């Protein structure tokens, strides 16, 4: 199920760390991805696609939400997770991912205190060793609420940045891990 179609020797040190973290994450959740029930999830707006793998015991799910092309001022996105236990409580967490600073191109020079070239030495060096957190998200909800869809953080619209902002752009995507809360785990939504 997991594969990379790229030359690993051409990756920056930052990208190599990201690939290693992705492989470790996949190994941990492989049973759900390989043996869970697989669903194409209905989506509320055009341009998005979603797939979910739900563990047979309904205690865990992995959901992909992907965007084809970015649109100006998109409506709020919702994450829908089918086939969970309606009365059970779940924690939803965005699988950590990062975005290269270079993705912002010439926008960086507008916020930097000194004049920088978008393809100059400083930004190329930063890009090799640092990336911005993308789309940090955690929520708790019932299986019924997840089946109806819960709202997600906004996407980047050209200005401003915070860790929870989704920096998708064209063909952007995010994986979400959904895990049932144990009886001894605190429900942070009360």
Model-derived segments and their meaning:
Residues 1-152, 156, 176:
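Active-site-proximal substrate-binding groove within the catalytic cores of carbohydrate-active enzymes
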Residues 161, 165-173, 179-190:
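Mature N-terminal, pre-catalytic/accessory segment of carbohydrate-active enzymes
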């Amino acid at each position: 199920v997991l594969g990379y179609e790229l030359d690993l020797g051409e990756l920056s040190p930052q990208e190599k760390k990201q690939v290693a973290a992705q492989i470790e994450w996949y190994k941990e959740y492989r049973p759900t991805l390989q043996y869970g029930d697989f669903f194409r999830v209905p989506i509320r707006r055009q341009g998005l696609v979603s797939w979910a793998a739900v563990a047979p015991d309904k205690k865990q799910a992995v959901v992909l939400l992907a965007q084809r092309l970015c649109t100006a001022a998109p409506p709020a996105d919702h994450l829908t997770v089918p086939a969970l236990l309606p009365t059970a409580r779940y924690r939803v967490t965005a699988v950590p991912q990062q975005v290269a600073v270079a993705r912002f191109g010439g926008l960086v020079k507008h916020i930097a205190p000194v004049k920088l070239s978008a393809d100059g030495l400083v930004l190329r060096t930063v890009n090799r060793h640092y990336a911005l957190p993308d789309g940090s998200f955690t929520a708790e909800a019932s299986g019924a609420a997840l089946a109806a869809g819960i709202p997600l953080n906004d996407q980047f619209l050209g200005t401003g940045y915070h860790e929870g902002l989704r920096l998708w752009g064209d063909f952007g995507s995010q994986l979400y891990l959904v895990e049932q809360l144990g009886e001894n785990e605190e429900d942070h939504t009360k």
